């Protein structure tokens, strides 16, 4: 080395010399060799070592850095995204006697843009004595890459005013900025400029146009640009395949992959594999995915983090978790995204414990979980028994400071909702309510509905209105369901007016919700008016009104509407048949109902559910054909559930068939030993038939096994305020007055009835 220096030879860089940068620099004696050494390091992509050599040279010598070396150092900072070093070198340039020109300034602009310091870039740009096309393009690129599309567009217009003609690089940057701003009109103008200035043959501009049209959801335009490129490159194919995959044209994405492979010119990269595998996931076609997996192996990309991650996600979404795990284990250097995919795959397929186990492996492997990791893990905690595990995850979230992430807080809310802990839901929501978004509000409103707290839901909605968060169609759906829960037609009408005022009423989802609300609140006329006003009625619209008619006792109207639905060419679904079977039951059309039940599968391909079976049991039982109802249950292909047996039990009570009621109750208690309804109905039947001994035995059994009747609840609306009452409520603020009035009414009833009825009333009162 010393001989080379004495001879004034150019400095060449080897790996061994890189390991000892300081010692190498300390042996350099001339300014020329110092500059050559730094340039050589930069050229060999040893950016950190080049910057260290610069620091060492400045501290230990008075060598003058040349213009070309400054350019190399600035490029090193750009490539390594080292903003601090870039500023340091820029300051050194300003304080030196270096006569720097537009080329150096352009490199400085590019460095600041790539490092994300747009303020510095703009300051340099504004003070440049001379600016050329590269200067403008560098700053426009910086704005575009950092999500400031509007600023990029303003600067581009200023560039045109200075009579600078954009080249393909300028077009590439400004088209990307236009795509991020979602300005379709400007995008079309830029496309016209590309054609006018004959840049349409340049790949950079053309590929940018494809990406822009994909961003605008205009795949036909993207496809026209793609097929107008005479010599496509890998980016062209990658952009069009990604576009089709992202926008739901999965078969087209796979078709373009096949077309690309047929030319035999390009080998897919990890990004093309990722887009193609996403298409397979959306189609739920693991057979296609496994073929692409074979291509990945052939291309030696199966161990690549991006391709491996996509493979893992595809197998997990298609339910092949063992394959997903094998692919994950083959990834050479898994990153956080790879871990997140396998955790999400397990969680979304219901393997909560396995997801937690992989999460623990992730942490023990030295990876720090991010918000996606935690959200995926929380998705697995969907049952009350998972509450303890969910709380542990909550403690991790607090420990790692993720409570500031709103998406994580929303996932926590959802977890507590599924795990039936409304108290924790409320406490958590109050902690971040001031920062809540529409997802947060909708989640807490849904939680209230799921836990039968419609009045609390309405209170929270009023708070939402005074917040900065605007209700959306999901909010309206929750409100309408809440109105149904408390049977408040007045409140439902107010929600209807609010949806009209906010412009949400025209949405199909809202209209269907309004039909349901009006029907269940007893205003079938208004429900029908909304139905008739709809331009595009879907199966939900028809089914909702049919069910509404049926449940309100208008069976004939429901069946007429069902015929109209079939005439309109709308294929019924399982909900439709619940409605028509209920209608047949209410109007006593037993044979018609049995015929419809038979045609469900033969004509419409709908497999009967337990709900349909329950409707048939009700149909037969209401007609007094209890033995047929019993035989139907015994011959069911599905295992009868509590609802089916309860339907029979209720019918037995109406028909006074104690023997069959006993069988129904026993089957209910086999499934749910603590079911209070079975005990109470059977007890009531024994009392009604004068069998006081068996009634008393049942009552004693309930007390022994701590079986408690679910307290009834009712609402009353007085002066726009909803009052809620529970049976045996000890917390109501006016409970003493309420119970005094009830006691007086009860005493009056006992005084005015005959002795036989008096005994029955006393027993009912004692059994609750």
Curated annotation (Swiss-Prot):
Native species: Arabidopsis thaliana
GO function terms (MF aspect): RNA binding
Signal peptide start-end: none
Similarity remark: Belongs to the PPR family. PCMP-E subfamily.
Protein name: Pentatricopeptide repeat-containing protein At3g53360, mitochondrial
NCBIfam families, per database record: PPR
Chain segments carrying region Type E motif: 644-719
Any GO BP: RNA modification
Gene3D superfamilies registered for this protein in UniProt: Tetratricopeptide repeat domain
Chain residue ranges for the region called Type E(+) motif: 720-750
Subcellular location: Mitochondrion
């Amino acid at each position: 080395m010393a001989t080379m220096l004495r001879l004034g030879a150019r400095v060449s860089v080897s790996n061994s010399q890189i390991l000892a940068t300081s010692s190498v620099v300390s042996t350099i004696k001339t300014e020329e060799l110092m500059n050559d050494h730094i340039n050589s390091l930069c050229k060999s992509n040893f950016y950190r070592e080049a910057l260290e050599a610069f620091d060492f040279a400045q501290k230990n010598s008075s060598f003058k850095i040349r213009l070309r070396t400054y350019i190399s150092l600035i490029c090193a900072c750009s490539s390594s995204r080292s903003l601090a070093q870039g500023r340091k070198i820029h300051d050194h340039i300003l304080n030196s006697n270096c006569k720097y020109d537009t080329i150096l300034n352009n490199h400085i602009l590019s460095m600041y843009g790539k490092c994300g310091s747009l303020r510095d870039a703009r300051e340099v740009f504004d003070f440049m004595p001379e600016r050329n096309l590269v200067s403008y393009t560098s700053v426009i690129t910086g704005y575009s890459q950092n999500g400031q599309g509007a600023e990029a567009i303003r600067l581009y217009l200023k560039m045109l005013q200075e009579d600078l003609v954009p080249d393909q690089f300028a077009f590439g940057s400004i088209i990307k900025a236009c795509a991020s701003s979602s300005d379709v009109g400007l995008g079309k103008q830029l496309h016209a400029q590309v054609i006018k200035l004959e840049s349409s043959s340049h790949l950079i501009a053309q590929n940018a146009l494809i990406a822009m049209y994909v961003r605008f959801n205009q795949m036909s335009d993207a496809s026209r640009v793609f097929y107008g490129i005479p010599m496509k490159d890998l980016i062209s194919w990658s952009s069009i395949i990604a576009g089709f995959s992202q926008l739901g044209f999965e078969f087209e994405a796979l078709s373009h992959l096949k077309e690309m492979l047929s030319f035999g010119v390009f080998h897919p990269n990890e990004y093309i594999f990722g887009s193609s595998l996403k298409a397979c996931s959306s189609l739920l076609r693991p057979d296609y995915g496994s073929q692409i997996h074979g291509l990945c192996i052939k291309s030696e990309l199966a161990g690549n983090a991006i391709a491996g991650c996509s493979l893992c996600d595809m197998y997990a979404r298609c339910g092949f978790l063992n394959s997903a795990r094998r692919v994950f284990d083959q990834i050479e250097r898994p990153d956080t995204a790879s871990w997140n995919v396998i955790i999400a795959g397990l969680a979304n397929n219901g393997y909560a414990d396995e997801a937690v186990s992989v999460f623990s492996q992730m942490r023990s492997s030295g990876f720090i979980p991010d918000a996606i990791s935690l959200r995926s893990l929380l998705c697995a905690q969907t049952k009350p028994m998972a509450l303890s595990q969910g709380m542990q995850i909550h403690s991790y979230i607090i420990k790692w400071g993720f409570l500031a992430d709103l998406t994580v807080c929303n996932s926590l809310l959802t977890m507590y909702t599924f795990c039936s802990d409304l108290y924790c839901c409320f406490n958590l929501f109050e902690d971040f309510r001031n920062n809540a978004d529409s997802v947060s509000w909708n989640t807490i409103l849904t939680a209230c509905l799921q836990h039968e707290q419609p009045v609390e839901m309405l209170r929270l909605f009023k708070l939402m209105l005074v917040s900065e968060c605007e209700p959306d169609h999901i909010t309206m759906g929750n409100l309408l369901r809440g109105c149904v829960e408390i049977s408040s037609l007045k409140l439902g009408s107010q929600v209807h007016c609010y949806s009209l005022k906010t412009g949400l009423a025209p949405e199909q989802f809202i209209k269907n919700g309004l039909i349901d609300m009006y029907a269940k609140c007893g205003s079938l006329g208004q429900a029908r008016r909304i139905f008739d006003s709809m331009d595009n009625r879907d199966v939900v619209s028809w089914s909702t009104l049919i069910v509404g008619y049926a449940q309100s006792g208008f069976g004939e109207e429901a069946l007429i509407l069902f015929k109209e639905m079939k005439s309109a060419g709308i294929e019924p679904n399982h909900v439709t048949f619940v409605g028509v079977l209920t209608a047949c039951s209410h109007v006593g059309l037993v044979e018609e109902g049995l015929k419809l039940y038979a045609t469900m599968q033969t004509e419409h391909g709908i497999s009967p559910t337990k709900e349909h079976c329950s409707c048939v049991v009700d149909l037969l039982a209401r007609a007094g054909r209890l033995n047929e109802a019993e035989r139907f249950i015994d011959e069911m292909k599905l295992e009868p559930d509590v609802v089916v047996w309860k339907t029979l039990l209720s019918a037995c009570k109406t028909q006074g068939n104690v023997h069959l009621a006993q069988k129904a109750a026993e089957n209910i208690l086999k499934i749910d030993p603590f079911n209070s309804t079975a005990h109470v109905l059977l007890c009531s039947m024994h009392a009604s038939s004068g069998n006081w001994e068996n009634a008393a035995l049942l009552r004693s059994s309930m007390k022994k096994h701590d079986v408690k009747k679910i307290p009834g609840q009712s609402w009353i609306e007085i002066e726009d305020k909803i009052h809620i009452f529970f049976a045996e409520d000890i917390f109501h603020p006016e409970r003493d007055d309420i119970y005094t009035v009830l006691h007086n009414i009860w005493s009056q009833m006992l005084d005015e009835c005959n002795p036989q009825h008096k005994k029955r009333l006393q027993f009912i009162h004692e059994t609750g």
